[in-house]
Regions:
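Histidine-centered, transition-metal-coordinating active-site segments
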Residues: 1-173
Length: 173
């Protein structure tokens, strides 16, 4: 919780009014922010596998090795018959893992709801849930995407285009 963004001094009155209206204590985060944070992490970390596959960065072998390294090979059960169609394989794997992660994270949230409401819970709900191993798998797989030259070139090009557009618009004012 402490690493999350706060508010500007100029917003202090608004912040205090929100805290009072929601019945939160001091620096306690709203309980739903824990679920929102987890859902965001699950959605983006797992979707990276599809992007990596489409770019030819993440292969079936890499997927199997990474799941095995993190002691999660059971997640691949039932998908073997789709190995000849990697687009479908990766899509089904994403759906299966996202569903499992959402269920396990929600279960952990419900288990810790009193700590969360009281402001005694100061961690990411996904990290402490039974879904943390799967999260680690997808975080490791995403590293291959972000260190790949194709991805880096695309990001650099995007940055150049945005800089050009912003400079053009700024100078037009």
């Amino acid at each position: 919780s402490q690493k999350k963004y706060g508010y500007f001094t100029s917003e202090k009155e608004d912040y205090n009014r929100i805290i009072e209206t929601l019945g939160l204590k001091g620096k306690t985060r709203h309980p739903l922010t824990f679920l929102l944070e987890a859902a965001d992490d699950i959605a983006y970390s797992v979707s990276d596998i599809e992007d990596g596959h489409k770019l030819g960065i993440i292969t079936l072998d890499r997927i199997k090795r990474t799941f095995s390294t993190h002691d999660c090979p059971g997640e691949l059960v039932g998908l073997k018959k789709y190995e000849s169609n990697m687009d479908l394989y990766v899509r089904l794997l994403r759906i299966k893992c996202q569903s499992k992660m959402l269920i396990k994270t929600t279960k952990e949230y419900n288990r810790r709801i009193n700590e969360i409401i009281e402001g005694d819970f100061d961690s990411e709900i996904l990290k402490v849930s039974e879904a943390s191993k799967l999260r680690d798998v997808f975080k490791e797989l995403s590293v291959y995407n972000f260190s790949n030259i194709k991805v880096l070139k695309c990001e650099l090009l995007g940055q150049e285009v945005l800089s050009y557009l912003l400079n053009t618009f700024y100078n037009a004012l």
